[in-house]
A protein has these predicted regions:
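Hydrophobic ligand-binding cavity/cleft-lining segments
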Residues: 1-37, 44
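Well-ordered beta-strand positions in beta-sheet-rich domains
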Residues: 4-6, 61-63, 87-89
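Hydrophobic beta-strand positions in extracellular immunoglobulin-like domains
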Residues: 9, 53, 105-107
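Amphipathic alpha-helical segments that line or abut small-molecule/effector binding pockets
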Residues: 14-17, 129, 133
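Short, flexible helix/strand-to-coil boundary loops that buttress conserved ligand/catalytic motifs
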Residues: 20, 30, 79, 116, ...
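Glycine-rich portal/gate segments that line the openings of hydrophobic small-molecule binding cavities
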Residues: 37-83, 95, 100, 130-142
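Beta-strand/loop substructures that line and gate deep hydrophobic ligand-binding cavities in soluble
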Residues: 78-130
């Protein structure tokens, strides 16, 4: 399942990127996130985060690793647990009078759970939409 959300905010791109590339800020903008902690690293490629989110009435833990970091422009992570693999890609574009963020989230259910994809897809869409709305509000406060 692949979701792309784009939003433009008045905040300067350097502040937007600094905020996004600290994945622990998900607790401030993603309504599904219960907590996110940095397990190892200092934010660069290879940094590991543990995210606990509430999804369909249950808490799920996903361990993420930063896979791409192009300072000021792109931040990408790969997350995994026993049931899914997730890829989050955040791209930042300076618009002169604001910043456009393109947020791409991809989820792949593992094993026999793949057959549940059509059932889970609407809930994941709501999850991504809620995250994008929360992200817009958080970035507008920068």
């Amino acid at each position: 399942m692949h979701f792309v959300r784009q939003l433009t905010v008045p905040a300067p791109s350097d502040r937007v990127f600094a905020y996004l590339s600290d994945f622990t800020t998900t607790t401030e903008w993603d309504p599904a996130t219960v907590r996110t902690s940095c397990i190892s690293g200092s934010g660069g490629v290879g940094t590991r985060y543990r995210n606990v989110s509430s999804f369909l009435g249950r808490e799920a833990t996903v361990d993420y690793v930063v896979t791409e970091l192009d300072p000021g422009r792109r931040f990408a992570l790969r997350g995994e647990n026993a049931t899914l693999v997730a890829h989050d890609d955040m791209r930042v574009q300076d618009e002169g009078v604001g910043t456009t963020v393109t947020y791409t989230a991809t989820f792949e259910l593992k094993g026999f759970r793949k057959i549940a994809t059509p059932v889970v897809a609407p809930a994941l869409k709501r999850l991504v939409d809620g995250g994008a709305d929360g992200l817009r509000r958080a970035l507008q406060r920068l």
